[in-house]
Amino acid sequence: FKRIIDTCKLKNIQVEVYDNPLFINKNQDLSSFFRSDKKKFFQTSFYKQQRLKLDVMMIGDKPEGGKWTYDDLNREKYPKGKIPPTITYPEKNKIYTEAFNYVNDNFNNNYGKINEEIIYPYNFKLAKEWLNAFLKTRFEEFGPYEDAVVKERSILNHSVLSPLINIGLINPKHLVKSILDYYYQHNIRINSCEGFLRQIIGWREFIRGVY
């Protein structure tokens, strides 16, 4: 980005930078934290600033529950014999079938393996259903098993919402509101809500600012 700006200045080209709706922060929101005179940037400091600015899980200027993070509660092993929540994937359609056959016919020797079934939602309706399914079946235990790994299980209690946010099927501001509404209405455990929101308003926005 800096090289683009510098080159445009050199060529006397006027630059207009637009805010990206795929992120919560505007460009000017990031400039105060990611200053050029700072040598190090810490995600924890950024995250606290985000919580205060967005008034997310705050009681005045104090974090709800008395702690900024509950990461120490989010490292449990998945219990032996516990059955993970059922995942309902989108139904395969004609377009996906055509794409699947095309890739197999023309790139059969390439690395990787393409799934015969659709994994991710591909429109706004399916994205909304996917979010609601996460809230109802996986959100409550998202926190404790956030770092858990089980052989032959790829999702467990994760949301798998990142691809949908990254391509604009779910707006991050709407996502934060949906998470908070469900948290308060259904008495979801605090470490699950905080741990999830830290990924959205903390890590995701922080890494964007770093880049």
Features from the language model and the residues they span:
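Beta-rich, aromatic/charged-enriched effector core domains that present basic-aromatic interfaces
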Residues: F1-I119
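Catalytic cores of enzymes that engage adenine nucleotides and/or redox cofactors via long glycine-rich
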Residues: L73-Y211
